[in-house]
């Protein structure tokens, strides 16, 4: 049961390494920008997949285990509503207050500007993360570990070349610079 999740976490680690490599080609200020946003990005991932994901899967599984399909459907609907609310909250915090937050972490100059550019794209589009991780958790709660694992792994594998293309302007893609990995994460 754990194999798809182990592979998913491993592939997600490769995504972070690839993003660092692509952004490192842009320069040290851009790499510092990525480092400034990393705690916020990790919080998004841990909240949408870990904290909420575990609760959603557990809630759906318990309802189905007690043969209460209506309760399972209610749990899934509530999970999607919470994900929508968290999307708005994360966007307000990290887009609306990104500059002072990243400045408080020591960001200044080009690194701060890059962090703001990255976080604006990432957190305006973070609904994609919340939706994907919430739907994956609902499926896990039904006992289907395979489908969400394959979907999340596929998305991560697609994210790597897309990140390079959008960060460095490969193959006619727009060169978004430090915002490229954020755009790739939202799209994939």
Residues covered by each model-derived region:
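Short hydrophobic/small-residue motifs within alpha-helical transmembrane segments
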Residues: 10, 126-130, 154
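Interfacial/gating helices of multi-pass transporter permease domains
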Residues: 23-42, 110-117, 178-183
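Short alpha-helical transmembrane segments in multi-pass integral membrane proteins
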Residues: 1-5, 60-127, 158-161, 165-188
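Hydrophobic alpha-helical membrane segments of integral membrane proteins
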Residues: 149-151, 183
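Alpha-helical transmembrane segments of multipass membrane proteins
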Residues: 17-21, 43, 92, 100, ...
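Helix-loop interface residues and adjacent transmembrane-helix termini in multi-pass membrane transporters
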Residues: 14-17, 25-28, 63-66, 141-142, ...
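Small-residue-rich hydrophobic transmembrane alpha-helices
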Residues: 31-92, 129-143, 147-148
């Amino acid at each position: 049961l754990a194999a798809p999740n182990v592979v998913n976490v491993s592939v997600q680690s490769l995504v972070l390494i690839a993003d660092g490599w692509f952004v490192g080609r842009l320069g040290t200020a851009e790499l510092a920008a990525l480092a400034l946003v990393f705690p916020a990005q990790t919080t998004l991932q841990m909240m949408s997949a870990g904290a909420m994901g575990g609760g959603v899967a557990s809630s759906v599984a318990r309802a189905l285990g007690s043969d209460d399909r209506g309760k399972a459907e209610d749990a899934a609907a509530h999970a999607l509503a919470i994900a929508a609310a968290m999307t708005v909250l994360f966007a307000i915090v990290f887009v609306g207050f990104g500059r002072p937050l990243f400045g408080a972490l020591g960001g200044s100059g080009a690194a701060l500007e890059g962090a703001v550019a990255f976080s604006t794209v990432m957190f305006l589009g973070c609904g994609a993360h919340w939706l994907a991780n919430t739907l994956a958790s609902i499926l896990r709660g039904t006992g289907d570990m395979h489908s969400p694992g394959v979907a999340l792994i596929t998305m991560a594998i697609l994210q790597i070349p897309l990140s390079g293309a959008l960060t460095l302007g490969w193959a006619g893609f727009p060169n978004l610079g430090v915002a490229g990995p954020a755009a790739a994460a939202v799209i994939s």
